[in-house]
Structures are given as structure tokens and as C-alpha cells.
Amino acid sequence: MSNLIPGEIIPEQGQIELNLSKQVKTVTVSNSGDRPVQVGSHYHFYEANKALIFDREITYGMRLDIPAGTAIRFEPGDTTDVKLVPFSGLRNAYGFNSLVNGSLNS
């Protein structure tokens, strides 16, 4: 019998660096709304909730530089800096707020 457990993940020792070779942009974001806004790790930041005030043009094709499956919560009235990285792979964005629905390269 084997000691392996189906689906088990055995990580390497040490720290795993995320988005190591990606260009990082820091953007200041303010929540002008009266409710918290949460943005997930792979959400096209350009299309985030309109209550979030930031320079949208520079965030086109970018997502949060945080681990997959996590999110950042913006409380009403708060201002914070976030780090963004470019989408990789095919660089297609569908859904979200339907502002792109296609290639991020065009």
C-alpha cells in the first residue's frame, strides 16, 4: 500500500513568489459608495464597481496582485493603494461589466 492520498498536494519547502516576472502597477483606490466593495483576484480591475474611484485607463488589462481565490475589500469612504499585474495567457475578458467582451490586446 502507498502512503499517497488522492488529491494531496505536497508543496516544496520555502516561499512561493507570485507573479515574479510581471510588471506591477500601484493604484490608489477610494470607495465613494455607502457599501463595502469586494474585488476578486482575477477580476478585470478596469471593470470594477463604479463606486470605486481610481484612474481606470491605467488599469485596463490588469488584475490584483494577490493569491488566486482571494479578494480585497474596500470599505465605504476608505482610500487604499493596491498592486495590479497584467492578465496573462490569451488575455481575453468576457463578462465582468461587459466593457470588453473580447481581447484585451485590441
Curated annotation (Swiss-Prot):
Protein's UniProt keywords contain Metal-binding: no
Protein name: Urease subunit beta
Domain of life, source organism: Bacteria
Gene Ontology CC annotation, any one: urease complex
Assembly behavior: Heterotrimer of UreA (gamma), UreB (beta) and UreC (alpha) subunits. Three heterotrimers associate to form the active enzyme.
Pathway(s) where this gene product acts: Nitrogen metabolism; urea degradation; CO(2) and NH(3) from urea (urease route): step 1/1
GO molecular function, one term: urease activity
Documented EC number(s): 3.5.1.5
Family annotation (HAMAP family): Urease_beta
Family statement: Belongs to the urease beta subunit family.
